[in-house]
């Protein structure tokens, strides 16, 4: 399922876009405030961001800039600003596309399909030379395959799929061991250590960072 975040202060427009996207089987979150939108964007992984420029508290350009510092996820700007310098600024700040309001919803849907097609296949993830092939169920580093248990593999994949997003131990536990698991959160620390030990011969162990008091992130 493709997850999309819309940050748009025109609530009627945001709801209309949400309705159309939901009809196309996308999962949609909406924020009407710039700060809330930025917080949501940086706290949860999405497959696409749709941003207005003129927003309360934090403008869309700043949101675009901060998202682009963290991820290569596609960004589409939708705005009433039609001047060339506005378009140039939006694209220079990291947007993949720029649509001027008012627009036809079919055009927006087509542009969404286009930017999503340009994204690499998520079944193969490349994290600084750590290649994770979901279909083949294998991990290679510098051409060498790592011998991982299923739990180690699942843990690495979850972190990689949420690259640059800090995951709490409880979140990791839910994803890897299951929501009804009675495993304690310190087991996550144990398996992180296992993973780092297996990455150490390739000088990749520091790819998994500890965020003290919170959890882990892979960059």
From Swiss-Prot:
SMART domains: REC, Trans_reg_C
Known DNA-binding region: 122-219
GO cellular component, one term: cytosol
PTM annotation (4-aspartylphosphate): residues: 52
PROSITE patterns (UniProt xref): OMPR_PHOB, RESPONSE_REGULATORY
Primary subcellular site in the record, as a coarse category: cytoplasm
Keyword line: Cytoplasm, DNA-binding, Phosphoprotein, Transcription, Transcription regulation, Two-component regulatory system
Keyword DNA-binding: yes
One of the GO BP terms on file: regulation of DNA-templated transcription
SUPFAM superfamilies with a match to the protein in the record: C-terminal effector domain of the bipartite response regulators, CheY-like
Domain (Response regulatory) ranges: 3-116
One MF annotation (Gene Ontology) recorded for this entry: phosphorelay response regulator activity
This protein's record includes keyword Transcription: yes
Post-translational modification remark: Phosphorylated by ArlS.
Purpose of the protein: Member of the two-component regulatory system ArlS/ArlR.
UniProt name for this protein: Response regulator ArlR
Lineage: Bacteria, Bacillati, Bacillota, Bacilli, Bacillales
Gene giving rise to this polypeptide: arlR
